[in-house]
């Protein structure tokens, strides 16, 4: 499943295609959304926001389309009039004079008013988004030490969208490698220095991935360009200490780590 950086880059791509342009045609597959087709035609997409792995497409009339890709959903951008060659099932089409965005295969799709946005179950449940530029390491540290999260092992906590939205498995293993911690650690047992390192890594690694992944020089390192240090690198040497990276399963997901320097 795509993680926060991939979802945000997808949102950027969609925004670049249709933001600020009049919608000339709107189509929804689900019956409960059909009444909104006429309400949105002639409106504009004002912005596309991410909340972890969910997308919020905001329209100029105050409505917002909530969509969660889950495992199989995918957005596409095409030239208006183009006929895509795909076996996927179309769920949403938002068309402008020159570009059209299409949502395929997703099933978790709703139209929300401004009031409903504040009470939506998923949006209420998710924590702050790691790609929100307003979120600080100090706020992350406070969440780590809060009664709700301080006793949780990082193996599960760093996959919990209620803690921080947008994290996922590759970010989990890369953040813990950067912090020299294992998945069994808990925030309550860390030193002040370890907490500070982890709090920064929880923001720095996702933001670096968003900014550079997919266009990186494989010889670059954290702090310059993003690339995997342990994810999918089991059996290889750890570039920090020379130990051999291992693979196991934690919280039902593959976990990669260096047992020599992650203590």
Curated annotation (Swiss-Prot):
User: Which biological process annotations from GO are given for this protein?
Assistant: base-excision repair
Q: Which Pfam families match?
A: Fapy_DNA_glyco, H2TH, zf-FPG_IleRS
Role according to the record = Involved in base excision repair of DNA damaged by oxidation or by mutagenic agents. Acts as a DNA glycosylase that recognizes and removes damaged bases. Has a preference for oxidized pyrimidines, such as thymine glycol, 5,6-dihydrouracil and 5,6-dihydrothymine. Has AP (apurinic/apyrimidinic) lyase activity and introduces nicks in the DNA strand. Cleaves the DNA backbone by beta-delta elimination to generate a single-strand break at the site of the removed base with both 3'- and 5'-phosphates.
**Protein source organism:** Salmonella arizonae (strain ATCC BAA-731 / CDC346-86 / RSK2980)
Which cofactors is this protein said to need?
A: Zn(2+)
Show the InterPro entries listed in the entry. DNA_glyclase/AP_lyase_DNA-bd, DNA_glyclase_Znf_dom_DNA_BS, EcNei-like_N, Endonuclease-VIII, FPG_cat, MutM-like_N-ter, Ribosomal_uS13-like_H2TH, Znf_DNA_glyclase/AP_lyase
Q: What is this protein called?
A: Endonuclease 8
Q: Which residues bind DNA?
A: 70, 125, 169
Catalytic site = 2-3, 53, 253
Highest taxon of the source? Answer: Bacteria
What reactions does this protein catalyze? 2'-deoxyribonucleotide-(2'-deoxyribose 5'-phosphate)-2'-deoxyribonucleotide-DNA = a 3'-end 2'-deoxyribonucleotide-(2,3-dehydro-2,3-deoxyribose 5'-phosphate)-DNA + a 5'-end 5'-phospho-2'-deoxyribonucleoside-DNA + H(+)
Start and end residues of each FPG-type zinc finger? 229-263
UniProt remark on cofactor binding: Binds 1 zinc ion per subunit.
> What Gene3D superfamilies does the entry give?
1.10.8.50, MutM-like, N-terminal (3.20.190.10)
Q: Which PROSITE patterns match?
A: FPG_CAT, ZF_FPG_1, ZF_FPG_2
Keyword terms: DNA damage, DNA repair, DNA-binding, Glycosidase, Hydrolase, Lyase, Metal-binding, Multifunctional enzyme, Zinc, Zinc-finger
- Sample GO molecular function, one term: class I DNA-(apurinic or apyrimidinic site) endonuclease activity
Q: Which family does it belong to?
A: Belongs to the FPG family.
Q: What is its EC number?
A: 3.2.2.-, 4.2.99.18
